[in-house]
Amino acid sequence: MTYNKRLFTSESVTEGHPDKIADQVSDAILDEILKDDPNARVACETTVTTGMALISGEISTTTYVDIPKVVRETIKDIGYTRAKYGYDSQTMAVLTAIDEQSPDIAQGVDKALEYRNDISEEEIEATGAGDQGLMFGYATDETDTYMPLPIFLSHQLAKRLADVRKDEILDYLRPDGKVQVTVEYGEDDKPRRIDTIVVSTQHAEDVELAQIEKDIKTHVIYPTVDKALLDDETKFYINPTGRFVIGGPQGDAGLTGRKIIVDTYGGYARHGGGCFSGKDPTKVDRSAAYAARYVAKNIVAAGLAKQCEVQLAYAIGVAEPVSISINTFDTGKVSEARLVEAVRKHFDLRPAGIIKMLDLKQPIYRQTAAYGHFGRTDVLLPWEKLDKVNVLKDAVEIQ
């Protein structure tokens, strides 16, 4: 029997990928600052390359952080602890070039008094966005995590790849790695099977490719992927170049913010272009993208749509979003206009309102910097809450 089908592919990378090292370092520095100064302004950029890391950006804070120490501890946690891995947390150089936040930006954000948990309505209204921009959030009912299956499985496989290395199940693996999953969708637009899985993993020099292929299937793919999604036609490409010994920052330079599609929905939904890592929550690139996911997930969980994409947009120095747009891809039970009306009423999408609503001044960001910011099953994140489901149902009068 033949049927119309489509294929969709997403990718993820391990915590040892150069760009993800940079993201984790930037967010580790952010967390360390927020522990003592939740009102800090942080825009921290990291560059990693052979033998060194460069930390740059703008930071305004009342606390002191030993940045080289944070950098070294983060890279050690990832697993780059020996020179033979091409990157050693203890012997690498750490350079810093940090400035304060521009006063021109600060005057647009800081109209309110210093942030407090009991921030008043007047203070919320007086706190403008830190930049202009547009942000997207998305949710779908095709998985229990309300994430598209290709990116969900890519993250699960990438995380498992790191776990078997750290637990020494496969002690010849090294920290760098990438995963790609192609899912076949049927006429009902639901996942039917996995068409292709690609795994590229850094490894010790003395391991044969046949051994790597066997071990990755046995210890990474089969324990992670539902066997019902695999069949005789599923294709596996494991280290398809045949060799992946040189990796990490020795193989490629890494930069904060270069894995924005990995961080979000794997290309399944649109992206506003701004990255997350290294940014404190006054930056709407981060906080509004989290809020948009929060809105979209609650709409889908409420049964008001099978898919939902939310766009928010802001002007620098202005508190209210300049636009809220919702697209349910013809799966909505009510009009998109009614959903927008309900969202405006029940979600505070002003920058300070988002921070208060999602409690974003906490040092929670390092854990988001690898394996995705959304749909996580291993950590609890405030924008993944489903506490607005009944509120939304009541707002649009759906029982």
From Swiss-Prot:
Query: Cellular component per GO?
Result: cytoplasm
Alphabetized, the UniProt keywords read: ATP-binding, Cytoplasm, Magnesium, Metal-binding, Nucleotide-binding, One-carbon metabolism, Potassium, Transferase
Tell me, what is an example of a GO biological process annotation in this record?
Answer: one-carbon metabolic process
Q: Which reaction does it catalyse?
A: L-methionine + ATP + H2O = S-adenosyl-L-methionine + phosphate + diphosphate
Concerning Gene3D superfamilies, the annotation shows: 3.30.300.10
A molecular function (GO) held by this record is: magnesium ion binding
The protein's required cofactor(s) are namely:
Mg(2+); K(+)
Q: How is the cofactor bound?
A: Binds 2 divalent ions per subunit. Binds 1 potassium ion per subunit.
Q: What is its main location?
A: cytoplasm
Annotated K(+) binding lies at 45
Residues the record lists as binding ATP: 17, 176-178, 243-244, 252, 258-259, 279
Q: Which InterPro entries match?
A: ADOMET_SYNTHASE_CS, S-AdoMet_synt_C, S-AdoMet_synt_central, S-AdoMet_synt_N, S-AdoMet_synthetase, S-AdoMet_synthetase_sfam
Q: Which residues are noted in the entry as Mg(2+)-binding?
A: 19
Q: Where in the cell is it found?
A: Cytoplasm
Q: Where is this region: Flexible loop?
A: 101-111
Q: What is its EC number?
A: 2.5.1.6
**Involved pathway(s):** Amino-acid biosynthesis; S-adenosyl-L-methionine biosynthesis; S-adenosyl-L-methionine from L-methionine: step 1/1
- Residues involved in L-methionine binding: 58, 101, 252, 283
What PROSITE patterns does this protein's entry cite?
Answer: ADOMET_SYNTHASE_1, ADOMET_SYNTHASE_2
The domain of life is: Bacteria
Which family does the similarity line name? Belongs to the AdoMet synthase family.
Give a short account of what the protein does: Catalyzes the formation of S-adenosylmethionine (AdoMet) from methionine and ATP. The overall synthetic reaction is composed of two sequential steps, AdoMet formation and the subsequent tripolyphosphate hydrolysis which occurs prior to release of AdoMet from the enzyme.
Extract the HAMAP family matched here.
Answer: S_AdoMet_synth1
Q: How does it assemble?
A: Homotetramer; dimer of dimers.
What this protein is called in its record is S-adenosylmethionine synthase
Query: Which organism is this entry from?
Result: Staphylococcus epidermidis (strain ATCC 35984 / DSM 28319 / BCRC 17069 / CCUG 31568 / BM 3577 / RP62A)
